[in-house]
């Protein structure tokens, strides 16, 4: 697995975990009747902190563990290929395009709920939801392009 594929896989796993936590907490707030601005904005903070710190920590940990395993197997220092060639840049560009497309669609749907009479809190909750989903879809698309060989 290439350096870029490892990064994408770790990011995908982290954002799937974050999406699960986010959906669990939103459903829990709705069922408890505690779906208010304070709780939703606190959840936003948790999601943002998780997205930043867990992704960075998990990426570093994954590369360290993969390097240790490779060093044990080959009895040599592992070669880290973090150089991006044109293919990697094109895959990243196409993945970013898909991410932005899904994000834009999510913003449109979120705004549509507001115009259809839903409270602004629903719109803000959907904005974060669609942002995370867009990132997941973009990562899946990037992985598919790497697996397909572009």
Segments predicted by a language model, with ranges:
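Helical transmembrane-bundle signal
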Residues: 15-22, 51-59, 104-107, 111, ...
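Alpha-helical transmembrane segments
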Residues: 41-61, 129-133
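Short membrane-interface loop/juxtamembrane segments of multi-pass integral membrane proteins
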Residues: 77-99
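Alpha-helical transmembrane segments and their membrane-interface junctions
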Residues: 98-120
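C-terminal or internal capping secondary-structure element at the end of a domain, subdomain, or sheet
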Residues: 118-150
């Amino acid at each position: 697995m290439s350096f870029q594929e490892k990064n994408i896989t770790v990011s995908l796993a982290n954002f799937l975990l974050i999406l699960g936590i986010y959906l669990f907490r939103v459903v829990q707030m709705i069922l408890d009747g505690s779906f208010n601005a304070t709780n939703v904005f606190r959840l936003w903070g948790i999601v943002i902190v998780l997205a930043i710190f867990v992704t960075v920590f998990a990426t570093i940990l994954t590369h360290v563990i993969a390097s240790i395993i490779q060093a044990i197997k080959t009895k040599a220092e592992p070669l880290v290929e973090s150089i991006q060639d044109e293919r990697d840049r094109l895959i990243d560009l196409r993945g970013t395009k898909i991410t932005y497309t899904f994000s834009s669609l999510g913003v449109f749907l979120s705004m549509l709920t507001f115009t259809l009479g839903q409270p602004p809190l629903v719109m803000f909750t959907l904005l974060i939801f669609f942002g995370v989903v867009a990132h997941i879809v973009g990562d899946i698309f990037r992985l598919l392009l790497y697996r397909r060989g572009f």
